[in-house]
Each structure stands twice: as C-alpha cells, then as structure tokens.
Amino acid sequence: DSKQDMCLYQNEFDQITRTMFSQMKNACSTNQINANFMREMIPHHQGAICMSKNALHFSICPQLIPILQTIIVSQEKGVREMRALLHCI
C-alpha cells in the first residue's frame, strides 16, 4: 500500500470512528433497554458499513472483498430492521 493510500484510508477511518462513537454516546436514552440498545447499535452498524465501503475504495486482497460486501448487506439490513422496530415500540 502506498503511503498516500494509507493516509487517505486512515483519515477516513478516523472520521468514521469519531462519528460512530459520538452518535453512540449521544443516543437518546429512555427507560427502555430495547430502545436504548437499538439507538446505540444503529450508529455502530452504520460505522461498520462506512468502514467496509472505505476499505473497498483501496487495493485490498480479493478474499476480503466478499467479506466486506457481506458486512455491508447484513448491517444495512440490521439498521432497517432496528429502525422499523423502534417505530413499533
């Protein structure tokens, strides 16, 4: 990996993690563990999606690509399901 790619990757990764942890920490808290958990986990899943997409922008080993694609699909599904469930509880 080139120094420039590593710098670009790391800068984006750092921004993603700052955003993710900030959103998790500042998630609205209620008296419901279920709602609190989902409000904290949605940004966590979104972080995993963004991290995976970030890695896919660079030259990575071919074996990692389907793993990252699976993470994106599964975490997007999880976010949709948790958002829908939050509206029901």
In which residue ranges do the predicted regions lie?
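His/Met- and acidic-residue-enriched segments that coordinate or traffic transition-metal cofactors
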Residues: D1-I89
